[in-house]
């Protein structure tokens, strides 16, 4: 009987956990500086180079990280050609800094998602390192 009760409790806990693809629209935008940079500051309109890792939000994961969907290095202009939350997340960073950014669907890919890797209504977690402002 105790075994059955334990199985039921465990099943209830697992069922209540967020999956990496569960819509998570109630999670707010937030940033956490993991390392504060000492170089020039990124402002809207700055051309920046960043290293990044991206995960789907999962409330049961370490640091709310679920499935990693992307990683790399790229250059862009803050406020142009990237999702709004990514631009907002890098604004105010200084070169050499690393920031964890939580992006709700409204500032990310919304109800459309992106390809096969980011489902509709996904909250995203990025860790971004500001490499340079050329």
Language-model features: where?
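Cross-family detector of peptidyl-prolyl cis-trans isomerase
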Residues: 2-134
């Amino acid at each position: 009987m105790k075994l059955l009760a334990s199985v039921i409790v465990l099943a209830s806990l697992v069922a209540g956990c967020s999956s990496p693809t569960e819509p998570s629209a109630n999670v707010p935008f937030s940033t956490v500086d993991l390392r504060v940079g000492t170089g020039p500051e990124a402002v809207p309109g700055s051309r920046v180079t960043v290293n990044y890792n991206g995960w789907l939000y999962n409330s049961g994961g370490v640091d709310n990280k679920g499935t990693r969907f992307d990683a790399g290095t790229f250059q862009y202009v803050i406020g142009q050609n990237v999702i709004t939350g990514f631009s907002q997340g890098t604004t105010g960073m200084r070169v050499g800094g690393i920031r964890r950014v939580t992006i709700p669907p409204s500032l990310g890919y919304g109800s459309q998602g992106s390809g096969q890797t980011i489902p509709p209504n996904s909250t995203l977690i990025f860790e971004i390192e500001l490499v340079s402002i050329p």
